[in-house]
């Protein structure tokens, strides 16, 4: 893969989830299949990501579109097991809200996460994932918090592994 540049796209920032793990490496590359410049991520047991903070009116713009290419599955991943939750790709949407209205347990979890990571957790999260076995469209609640939902956007070692796959989802409907 031909490296175009090592710096992140404008407005994108590293998001470190677990400081004890090696962060994912990101760079912009020219995809040899399409010739398009894309963001390439290389991770080895990482717990990090990239984020871009946006202020979007979900009633006016309820659709998100993206594409990704999955080269390999994480064989040990099982998103129905809290100790094996993992995905080779994720698109996470964070939502604002009044955290004081959440149950006390959720508030304590968010406070603890801030102590460990140095960052505030969002009020709610919708995570689009590639899952090993579950069918596309499956919604998985997080086993850690009721404020996170995972939606299977791609699944299994299907014929699309190694190929670009495009998605367009109404995230407002998906989160309900």
Identify the role of each PLM range.
Residues 39-61, 73-76, 145-155:
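Secreted extracellular polysaccharide-interacting domains
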Residues 51-53, 61-65, 86-91, 123-125, ...:
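Extracellular structured ligand-interaction cores
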Residues 86, 96-146:
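Extracellular/luminal beta-rich ligand-recognition
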Residues 121-123, 154-169:
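Trp-centered recognition loops
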Residues 1-20, 104-110:
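Extracellular carbohydrate-recognition regions
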Residues 74-95, 102-104:
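Beta-strand acidic-aromatic groove motif in beta-rich domains, primarily in extracellular
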Residues 24-48:
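Short carbohydrate-recognition loop motifs
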Residues 67-73, 96-98, 172:
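Solvent-exposed strand-to-loop "edge" motifs in beta-rich extracellular domains
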């Amino acid at each position: 893969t031909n490296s175009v540049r090592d710096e992140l796209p404008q407005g994108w920032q590293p998001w470190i989830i677990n400081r004890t793990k090696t962060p994912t490496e990101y760079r912009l590359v020219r995809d040899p299949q399409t010739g398009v410049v894309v963001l390439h991520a290389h991770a080895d047991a990482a717990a990090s990501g990239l984020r871009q903070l946006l202020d979007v009116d979900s009633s006016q713009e309820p659709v998100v579109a993206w594409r990704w290419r999955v080269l390999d599955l994480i064989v040990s991943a099982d998103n129905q097991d809290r100790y094996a939750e993992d995905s080779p790709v994720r698109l996470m949407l964070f939502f604002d809200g009044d955290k004081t209205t959440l149950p006390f347990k959720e508030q304590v979890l968010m406070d603890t996460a801030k102590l460990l990571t140095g960052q505030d957790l969002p009020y709610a999260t919708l995570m689009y994932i590639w899952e090993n076995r579950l069918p596309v469209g499956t919604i998985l609640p997080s086993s850690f918090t009721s404020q996170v939902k995972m939606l299977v956007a791609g699944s299994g070692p299907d014929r699309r592994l190694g190929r670009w796959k495009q998605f367009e989802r109404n995230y407002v409907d998906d989160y309900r």
